[in-house]
């Protein structure tokens, strides 16, 4: 496949300066290789060595020396990019095997990270690869301010649906906290455990990542697909169509004031805060016009 896809001459003459990192197997020494240091005719060998994820893949031997994946010693070679003349850096952290070295370049740096589990390093399933490519695209758009959200790619909210959702969500949350004051901490804990931003500030109804967080968290919890963009209203509608039994039915005492099961529901909410937030989001959306 590499013979079919890689044109060495095109790489060498490209205005985009190419480089790679390998790890010398015997010494575990990191070897940085800008394109001009790679001998003519050997680029494909160097690329195979740089991606030889040992021990699953065999080392690649070059001039009598065995090399493995450069990520073992330097999984985000920002230093190499700086040495090659970069004025600012864009790194991609796939949370893979290997060492991510501290960024000591002093250059302006942005790092693309995914909220989602990207799967095993050696999972080459085409469907997963397509999903991860889409997620990487959305994560990059988000980093450069072209879309919003934390987990989902959120498009502009031209209908101000998010503001209405946030206002109603905060109203219902305050009512629940009046029945069970610890629920405020439960809601914050759900965000923290699922890597979502803290609650709203300074305006509870402002269309911020914090305001989106409960809706995104609930959508993730019920399995709303993550590899497509959404407006807040579309995400809400997709969430509401993703279950047969309403999550809000699990917390009638907390959400509707039926005291007969309040103690048990408080315990459940504390144990699985994501379940409670999902229920509260469902209750909120049930009181808003979506379609």
Set out the residue ranges of the language-model regions.
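Patatin-like phospholipase
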Residues: 1-291
